[in-house]
C-alpha cells in the first residue's frame, strides 16, 4: 500500500476517523520513511465548516505537518444539478484531492474509510439499486487512493483515538437523518446489528470476494472486447456472447467507452425480450442474427451518390465499380420502401433478400446499393447481382462492417 520514500496526501475533515489516520501516519512516518501532507476542503455546507478548517490548520501546525486547504460552495453547485448534495460534495472533494496531490507531488492519497463506511455504502447501493459488481464499492487501494483503515471498525478507531487523546471535531450534521447516509447509519445498521453483531465483518468479506469477481470479469470483458468489438463512426458491433452476464458487461463497457455512462441492468435485459431497446435519446442496443450493435444504430439519413470514380466508401463499406459502358451511368444509394431486385428472372423484395441472407437489421439502411438511371437496384454488396447489370460492368465489395456478410465474403446469388 505504501512504499519507502513516498509522499502521501492525507484527506482530513477534522472528524475522528481522518484525524486518527493523520495521527497514525505521522506517528509511523519515520518508520515507514514516508512524507505526509494534510488536505482539507471546506464544502460550505455547514455554518461550522470554517471552525473545522481552522481546527485542522491549528493541529497541523502543532504536529508540524504541511496542510493544503480550500473551499467550494457545494450548495450552489448542487442547485439544478439533478444529483444529491452528497454526490456533488464527493465529486468536488475527490477533484480537490487529485489536484492537490499533483500540486504537492504526492503519489498516494490516504482516505479514512473503515468497515462501517463499507457497510453503509453497500446498504445504500442495494436500496438505490445496483448490479452484483456494484457491491465491489470501496477497495483498499485503487489508482492513487489508499484506505489503510478499511480493515477496522468505527468502534476500534474510536477506542484507539480515546486511548491516544487524538483531537477531533464533531460534525453535527452526522446525526441528521434527512441525509441518506445518516439514515442508514443511525436507523438501518443498528437493526442489522441486532441480527448479526458482526455484520461489518460479514459485509467486508462479501465485498472482498466481490472485488476478486470484478477483477475477473474486467479481465474477461477486456479480452472479449479486444478480440470481438469493432467501433465505427457512431456505433459499435460485436458477436453476441452466449453467456448472458458477459453480454451485459460487454455492452455496459462499450457504452461507457462511447458515452461515459451506463444504463441499469434492467434496460439491457429488456433487449432479450425486444430486439431493439432505446437506452437514451437516439442511443440503442440492437440484437440481430447473432450480432449486437450499440449506439446510434437507427440510420435515418438518405444518400444518393453518382459513381464517377472506381472507389466509393460509405457507412463502413468500400466498393469498387469499373464502368466499361459509356452509355450508362450509375448511382449508389441506400434502400427505400418497396425496393426489389431481379435475379435469374425472378423478382424479389429487397427486404426478403436481407432476411434470407441474415443481414443484421442495423445494417440494412446503410448498405450502398448500385442503381441505374431508372433507379432500379442492380447490385447488393456481397449478396446479389441483377439481371439488368451488364456483364462488362465490374462491381466488387472490398470492405464491409463486421457481421454484414455472415460466414464469408460473398453469398451465392439469390
From Swiss-Prot:
The gene is tilS. GO terms for molecular function: ATP binding; tRNA(Ile)-lysidine synthase activity. One of its GO terms (biological process) is tRNA modification. Belongs to the tRNA(Ile)-lysidine synthase family. The N-terminal region contains the highly conserved SGGXDS motif, predicted to be a P-loop motif involved in ATP binding. Ligates lysine onto the cytidine present at position 34 of the AUA codon-specific tRNA(Ile) that contains the anticodon CAU, in an ATP-dependent manner. Cytidine is converted to lysidine, thus changing the amino acid specificity of the tRNA from methionine to isoleucine. Its EC number is 6.3.4.19. It comes from Thermotoga maritima (strain ATCC 43589 / DSM 3109 / JCM 10099 / NBRC 100826 / MSB8). This is tRNA(Ile)-lysidine synthase. It is found in: Cytoplasm. GO terms for cellular component: cytoplasm. Pfam families: ATP_bind_3 (PF01171), TilS_C (PF11734). Keywords: ATP-binding, Cytoplasm, Ligase, Nucleotide-binding, tRNA processing. ATP binds at residues 13-18. It comes from the Bacteria. It is an enzyme of class 6 (ligase). Its main location: cytoplasm. CDD domains: TilS_N. It catalyses: cytidine(34) in tRNA(Ile2) + L-lysine + ATP = lysidine(34) in tRNA(Ile2) + AMP + diphosphate + H(+). InterPro entries: Lysidine-tRNA-synth_C, Rossmann-like_a/b/a_fold, TilS/TtcA_N, tRNA_Ile_lys_synt, tRNA_Ile_lys_synt_N.
Amino acid at each position: 500500500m505504501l512504499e519507502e520514500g513516498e509522499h502521501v496526501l492525507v484527506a482530513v475533515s477534522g472528524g475522528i476517523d481522518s484525524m486518527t489516520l493523520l495521527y497514525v501516519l505521522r506517528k509511523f512516518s519515520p518508520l515507514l520513511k514516508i512524507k505526509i501532507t494534510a488536505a482539507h476542503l471546506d464544502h460550505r455546507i455547514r455554518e461550522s465548516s470554517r471552525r473545522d478548517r481552522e481546527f485542522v490548520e491549528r493541529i497541523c501546525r502543532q504536529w508540524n505537518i504541511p496542510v493544503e486547504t480550500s473551499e467550494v460552495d457545494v450548495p450552489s453547485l448542487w442547485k439544478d444539478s439533478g444529483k444529491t448534495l452528497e454526490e456533488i460534495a464527493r465529486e468536488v472533494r475527490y477533484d480537490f484531492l487529485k489536484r492537490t496531490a499533483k500540486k504537492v507531488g504526492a503519489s498516494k492519497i490516504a482516505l479514512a474509510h473503515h468497515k462501517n463506511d463499507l457497510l453503509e455504502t453497500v446498504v445504500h447501493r442495494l436500496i438505490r439499486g445496483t448490479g452484483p459488481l456494484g457491491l465491489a464499492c470501496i477497495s483498499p487501494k485503487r489508482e492513487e487512493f489508499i484506505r489503510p483503515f478499511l480493515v477496522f471498525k468505527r468502534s476500534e478507531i474510536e477506542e484507539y483515538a480515546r486511548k491516544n487523546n487524538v483531537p477531533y471535531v464533531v460534525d453535527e450534521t452526522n446525526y441528521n437523518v434527512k441525509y441518506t447516509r445518516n439514515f442508514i447509519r443511525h436507523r438501518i445498521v443498528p437493526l442489522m446489528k441486532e441480527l448479526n453483531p458482526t455484520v461489518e465483518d460479514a459485509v467486508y468479506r462479501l465485498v472482498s470476494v466481490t472485488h476478486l469477481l470484478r477483477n475477473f470479469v474486467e479481465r474477461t470483458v477486456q479480452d472479449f472486447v479486444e478480440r470481438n468489438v469493432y467501433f465505427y463512426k457512431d456505433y459499435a458491433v460485436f458477436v453476441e456472447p452466449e453467456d448472458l452476464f458477459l453480454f451485459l458487461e460487454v455492452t455496459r463497457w462499450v457504452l461507457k467507452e462511447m458515452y461515459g455512462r451506463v444504463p441499469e441492468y434492467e434496460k439491457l435485459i429488456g433487449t432479450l425480450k425486444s430486439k431493439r431497446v432505446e437506452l437514451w435519446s437516439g442511443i440503442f442496443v440492437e440484437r440481430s442474427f447473432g450480432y449486437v450493435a450499440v449506439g446510434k444504430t437507427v440510420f435515418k439519413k438518405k444518400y444518393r451518390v453518382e459513381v464517377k470514380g472506381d472507389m466509393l466508401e460509405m457507412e463502413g463499406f468500400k466498393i469498387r465499380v469499373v464502368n466499361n459502358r459509356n452509355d450508362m451511368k450509375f448511382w449508389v444509394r441506400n434502400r427505400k420502401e418497396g425496393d426489389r431486385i431481379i435475379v435469374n428472372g425472378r423478382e424479389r423484395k429487397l427486404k426478403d433478400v436481407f432476411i434470407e441472407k441474415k443481414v443484421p437489421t442495423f445494417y440494412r439502411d446503410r448498405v450502398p446499393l448500385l442503381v441505374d438511371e431508372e433507379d432500379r437496384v442492380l447490385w447488393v454488396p456481397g449478396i446479389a447481382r441483377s439481371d439488368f447489370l451488364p456483364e462488362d460492368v465490374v462491381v466488387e465489395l472490398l470492405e464491409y462492417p463486421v457481421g454484414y456478410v455472415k460466414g464469408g465474403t460473398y453469398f451465392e446469388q439469390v
